[in-house]
Amino acid sequence: MSDLWEAQREALGAFIREQRKRANLSLRQLAEMTSLSNPYLSQIERGLHQPSVRVLKALSDALNLSAETLLA
């Protein structure tokens, strides 16, 4: 079961990184836009942390995505 959660965290992180790059934002810029720390956002992108719903909402707003897109 933990392998499944790990794979989901990694896939979500990779998707967030891809969307950030498509928006031409640096990690620091996205961190500032979402009031997240740069290291925490980096850990999310690397699949080391599962973000809360509040964090996903902040990321979706900053990246102009629907929250449902990040949760799918």
Predicted regions and their residues:
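Residues that mark the N-terminal boundary/hinge immediately upstream of a DNA-recognition element
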Residues: 15, 26, 52-55, 66
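Recognition helix of helix-turn-helix/homeodomain-like DNA-binding domains
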Residues: 35-50
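A detector for short, charged/polar N-terminal pre-domain segments
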Residues: 1-11
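Short basic helix-loop element that most often maps to the first helix and adjoining turn
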Residues: 14-31
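Conserved amphipathic alpha-helical interaction elements at protein-protein interfaces in regulatory
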Residues: 18, 22, 50, 62-65
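Residues within helix-turn-helix
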Residues: 28, 39, 68
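DNA major-groove recognition helix of helix-turn-helix/homeodomain DNA-binding modules
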Residues: 35, 54-69
